[in-house]
Amino acid sequence: MDERLKGYKDVFADHPGVKVVEVFNIKGDAGNAFDRTQHWLTEKGVEHIDAFVCLEASSGKDVAEAVRRNNATDRLIVAMDTDEATLGLVKSGLIDATIAQKPFTMTFFGLKQLDDVHHYPVDLKRDFATDSFSPFPRFVDTGVSLVDKVNVDLYIQGRQEAQSK
């Protein structure tokens, strides 16, 4: 989560009109996302909130529901991941965009690296981040993409095809 938040803050730093008001950890509980969103919209006032950015997959739909209940559907919502509910809310326009990861690719490369460690043992006490002779990369970028109303149907179709296999 820290790296995701840092990524957003790095981008926001180039946009002086964007201000992060509060960051809260829902601790994997979507109910916390709903409750905190309700709090911000009712206690602080809808007119003072322009956007919500969700860093966990479980929070997007609950943030969207709180926004809908407060008739604040003109607020920007950026979610995380491509679960069925989130994609449906992107398609409906309640969520403006979601960041898609590649869970199958992430799993494949993770298992591949474990298999390599098993079949080609190395000294695991080495600092692979600074060792220029390390057999392992310091970081593996499996990619992300932005899903919005323009391309959401492609992701819905891809999800359905993956589930039907």
Walk through the language-model features, giving the residues of each.
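Ligand-binding cleft/hinge of the Venus flytrap
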Residues: 4-16
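Short beta-strand elements at the ligand-binding edges of bilobed clamshell
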Residues: 92-104
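Structural detector of well-ordered beta-strand residues that form the stable sheet scaffold
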Residues: 50, 77-78, 96-99, 147
